[in-house]
From Swiss-Prot:
Designated name of the protein: Uncharacterized protein YhfU
Gene responsible for this protein: yhfU
Top-rank taxon, per record: Bacteria
InterPro entries in the record: DUF2620
Alphabetized Pfam families for the sequence: DUF2620
Length: 117
């Protein structure tokens, strides 16, 4: 079973959304940004999902520093919804850390999770 670390704002909501979208498919853990990023880097977690107000700043800054810029991406920003083809492309490129703005949790997380299954 794949493991996801959730960090940043709205962590509980993101965890519940993941569990509702793909019941029994993922183990979901709530961590602070540093813990989640370090666990992805060490292989203890498969993916990092972080939310903040912009989807690119606080949500991803630690992940970028620890996991690497080439393994991180923003899937939704204020006023810019997640796009299915963009998420598919990012996963195909090997991204494992995903940032999004809190306003897009309800639509972006199910879309992301369906690609990570």
């Amino acid at each position: 079973m794949k493991k996801i670390g959730v960090a940043g704002l709205q962590r509980e909501q993101i965890k519940k959304t993941i569990e509702a979208t793909a019941p029994g498919c993922f183990e979901v853990f709530i961590h602070n940004d540093m813990e989640a990023a370090m666990k992805v880097k060490s292989g203890q977690l498969d993916y990092y999902i972080g939310a903040c107000n912009t989807g690119a700043g606080a949500a991803l800054s630690i992940a970028i520093a620890v996991i690497g810029y080439n393994k991180s991406c923003t899937i939704a920003k204020p006023g810019i919804k997640a796009k299915d083809e963009h998420i598919a492309k990012m996963i195909a490129e090997g991204k494992v850390a995903f940032g999004l703005s809190v306003e897009h949790v309800e639509h972006a997380i199910p879309m992301l999770i369906n690609h990570l299954k």
